[in-house]
Amino acid sequence: MTAARIVRDRIVEAVSTSGFGAHGLHVRIGAGEAEHRWTPDVLEDVHSVAKGVCVLAAAIAADEGAISFDVPVTVYVPDFERGEGVDEVTLRHLLTMSSGIDLPWSETLMTDWPDLAREFLRRPSRGRRFQYSNASTYTAMTALSARVGDVGDYLDARLFRPLGIDDVVWTRSPNGRIQAGGGLPLRTSEMARIGLLIRDRGWWQGTQLVSSGWIDAMHENGVVAGPNPGYDRYALAGWGGPGRGWRLHGAHGQLLIFLDDAVVTITAADHFGADEMAATVVDILETARRGA
């Protein structure tokens, strides 16, 4: 039995024991893969995993010379009103949640203002402080759209279609831009392809879709996010942990978990059980590595 199948079976057992509300599971270790379904593989919002997809969009644009991560984001939206300190905020700050701009989450965040990005940038920055917000990713993609046009169309051509992911329909804000920090419906199998691209440092079937350095930056040299394990470091959309692993983590249990040559994809409807499940997955991967 392959390592991927062993890990899959142990995760399935852990889900059964814990009662975690899993929908789908895909395990890739080396060239081996295995999957399991609890529910049909239908389109589901991957929530904040979409932030990682937005990082890939910005990375591809940077590879093409269309945008820079390290110049003030106001260069790309010069007509936007800006708060105190905002002229120092870069695309990298927005995508690492370290802009220092405070805009509290609400259920109606995307519709509370005519243009969320304008509202975000007109507020003051407190310097390089971690402040997790969908508005931060949305503002980054607003800046990107000023250089590449519609970000959804840009991703279709350069990421989704090369991965064999067709007919992607983002949830849109009232002004027509993708919601960016969420609102991306994918199947488990499609999310797993994005996970494999990331695991393989930007390569897909012999073609490099995004430079490896950007993939590394998704989980290396992150900013201090807080005191709690698993939420203490945040890089370009990637959370450090559990353990030696790192992950893209969407609400309600949408997970891409990376450890060495393994990537585990989980879709679910279980917000509060996700942290424990992520830790269990990493423990299972580490045990399998030891041959136990």
Locate the predicted segments by residue.
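Active-site helix/loop module of the DD-peptidase/beta-lactamase fold
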Residues: E64-M97, A146-G182, L186
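Active-site-proximal alpha-helical segments within enzyme catalytic domains
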Residues: S136-A143, G182-W203, Q254-A269
